[in-house]
Design a protein with these regions (language model features):
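Structured C-terminal cores of nucleic-acid metabolism proteins
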Residues: 1-74
C-alpha cells in the first residue's frame, strides 16, 4: 500500500496496538510492518534489542498523510 494512503487509513487509529514484524534495522532507524492494514513505518521508541524478523506489539503514535510518515512505539 502507498505510504500516503496507509497514513490516511491509519490516521483514525492512532493509539491502537498492532502486531508487527521488524523489516529493517539501519542507522537511521528501525522499521516495522503491520499486516492489517498492510503498512510500514518507523519504530520511534523501543527499538533497542530488536532484529529483522522479530515480531512485536507496537502502538501507532502518529500518521501524516501529507508526508506519508507513520510512526510506531513499543
Amino acid at each position: 500500500m502507498n505510504k500516503r494512503i496507509a497514513a490516511v487509513v491509519l490516521l483514525p487509529r492512532i493509539g491502537e496496538m498492532f502486531s508487527a514484524v521488524v523489516t529493517g534495522v539501519t542507522p537511521k532507524g528501525t522499521f516495522v510492518r503491520v499486516l492489517n492494514p498492510h503498512a510500514e513505518g518507523l519504530l520511534i521508541r523501543g527499538q533497542q534489542g530488536v532484529d529483522v524478523g522479530d515480531q512485536l506489539q507496537v502502538k501507532l503514535v502518529s500518521a501524516d498523510p501529507r508526508r506519508g510518515y507513520i510512526d510506531f512505539a513499543r
